[in-house]
Amino acid sequence: ANAKVRLVLCLNKSSGQLVWQKPLDLTELGDTPAAMVNNGVLVLFGVYLDGHYWQQFFAGQFAGRRVTALDGHDGKQLWSQQVGYRVRPLIIGDTLHAEPWAFDLKTGEAQKRAHPVTGEEERWQFARPGHHCGAPSASPHMLFFRSWNLGYYDLDGDYGTMHFGAQRPGCWINFLPVGGLAVMAEASTGCMCDFPNQGTVVFQPVRENKAWAWFSAPGLATPVKDLALNLGALGDRRDASGKLWLAYPRPSGSLVLALEGEAAFYAGGRFSQGESVYAETAGTDAPWLFSSAATGLRKLSLRLVQPGDGTATYRVRLGFSEPVHSAPGQRVFDIVLQGQGKPGASIDPPTLGGGFWYSPTITGSWSDER
């Protein structure tokens, strides 16, 4: 008796003549149903209040939010399912993006990818930590949105949310791709958030990507199959082979991939960052990997398997650099894995030769049931 049945109509855009009509129950589309169409698919969904509702999202209060897709030619239902998205969806080509997930436009099947650590197939998702007013906008290859500041996502590179500081979009959709540029039109007047920056800002593309990203993945990052860590880095990034290097310590935020671990340093030790663009490089095609480091590291503990996963054997490769031109014998590293020293596992970076940056590797294996 309380069903919200509406009549969905398709009209010929030239003549205005009725092509088809279909009664549809829109109860699970909320109080403000909306529609969009692409590639012959009509998508019906609900528009809900904008705001910072992560607590409600994780509590499952949005689980009943439904999306329905109809064939635009005859009104036949292609699919209808509860998606539980956070803000209004958008379409890019044949993909429906319903934050934080993505779906095949014509089938509703969830888009998936391999987890960069476990190798298991997981749902594609992205993170929008911090203040995240408004809904995303998009171009064929990018998502644009607020995440603390200006946030954007390279859908082709697919390595996480990137940020541009000191600017922020307004409270709705004003960060827009236009003619090869990214335009943030003024939309802050009357907003009471910090740094309203009342003005229009236009960004043009650059040839060299120097941005760090925050990758998102569901669940535990165990058991580990392949883990590439970039110690001290400001974010995540893929190398030329496509391997995703994860920053450690991990950036924090809702839906950002988390790792269970702990680092301990000798006196004066710390994670540090530099700028690879201005550093001499040798022996690597990814100098950004050596623009950060764990200096004076005494111990790094990482959770590779969970209790009950059984025994696992791993091979470990470590990268070293010599950025301070120290003399041989001044900075000798002894490598201990699982409490056991490894034969020949002493590294003296100044003796390795090459250039300003070095990237030798040390290998070893051990078992871990903890």
Where in this protein do the model-derived segments appear?
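A short acidic/small-residue loop/turn micro-motif
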Residues: L26-T27, Y85-R86, T118-G119, A345, ...
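Short, solvent-exposed loop/turn and secondary-structure capping segments
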Residues: D31, W54-Q56, D194-N197, G329
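Compositionally biased, intrinsically disordered or flexible polar/acidic segments
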Residues: K210-R370
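Extended, hydrophobic interaction surfaces within ordered domains
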Residues: M162-K210, G353-G354, Y358-R370
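Repeat-blade elements of multi-bladed beta-propeller folds
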Residues: A1-V8, K22-T68, S80-A102, Q125-L150, ...
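Aromatic (tryptophan-biased) beta-strands that constitute blades/sheets of beta-rich domains
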Residues: A1, L7-L26, R66-Q82, T107-H132, ...
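Ordered, small/hydrophobic-rich secondary-structure cores
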Residues: K112, E122-C171, L176-V178, G308-R317, ...
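Short, isolated positions in well-ordered beta-strands
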Residues: L49, L96-H97, F103, Q111, ...
